[in-house]
């Protein structure tokens, strides 16, 4: 059915890494079964279990089957493609599929799938929901057999890949009803350059005097109050810093970058970097003051992020040599509010820190909690099987 189009796909100079979870095996088989597959596929991965997906992403997702998870998977796959062929970043892509298809066990939510593709120039997300025919209350609400759903998924995966490669993909009719929607974010040139590390940051100079690094997912009142207090204490304009890569978190795609920069726009300027660690941030912005929570400060001092005591000590010494300062805000931890007096950190790091008193700032709120609450609310309202 797809032989001619598969030949066109494999003739394209674009290549990438594909990762599947919960569905999409038929599309991968179609790609591998056509001559020339090595021209398109650098690697394929199937992190099927929850623990395998956590290992692939670097952290457990709030939901294994969601647009956000698919996009994170595609972003990680793109970085993997760049690691496999670092000289082909302009041609590389990461393609992901996460799906909850018809199964023989009870499952919450409708049968659905998400296909994401991320590359240097653009991020795509295709959302698919299998719809149920009208039925009597006593019917068990089928939305197609798994084989029928896999046929749809195969068509949609190859269709999105064809769209990315500017190849026309044929329409097809299926015996199962479904709805499909495709969204995309085209990246401006400065985002693209930071994404592939052609630039350290999309801004420099005065933008780096006082920086507030974070994931900002989502932005909340605590972030805004920290910024206001930091500006009052330092006399400097505080700029938000958003890194495409983050320690212990999946890398960002363009949907995430757009969403978070738009959230932050009303509250100040955002500097985009590809600097997950503070030593990398410091090399880009020497003599900067970083606005951080005490939980972040503790991570800066932890040996596990460096590999050895000597490497950690060398990094802290370099922070000192680069003139880095930290303005530290306390945070609730296991029922207690932590500040510098209650933690033990390296003397050289402590010497670079100024603590904001609890009487000046205390906000017992976190983006993690807000995301979890939002995910639970979404699950509670999702139609489909109990």
Annotate the PLM regions.
Residues 14-17, 268-269:
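Short active-site oxyanion
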Residues 2-3, 8, 30-33, 51, ...:
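Nucleotidyltransferase catalytic core that binds NTPs
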Residues 11:
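Hard-cation-handling environments
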Residues 17-66:
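Glycine-rich, small/polar surface segments that engage phosphate groups of diverse ligands
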Residues 56-83, 257-272:
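Short, structured active-site "lid" loops
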Residues 4, 22-26, 68, 72, ...:
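Conserved active-site and cofactor/substrate-binding residues in soluble primary-metabolism enzymes
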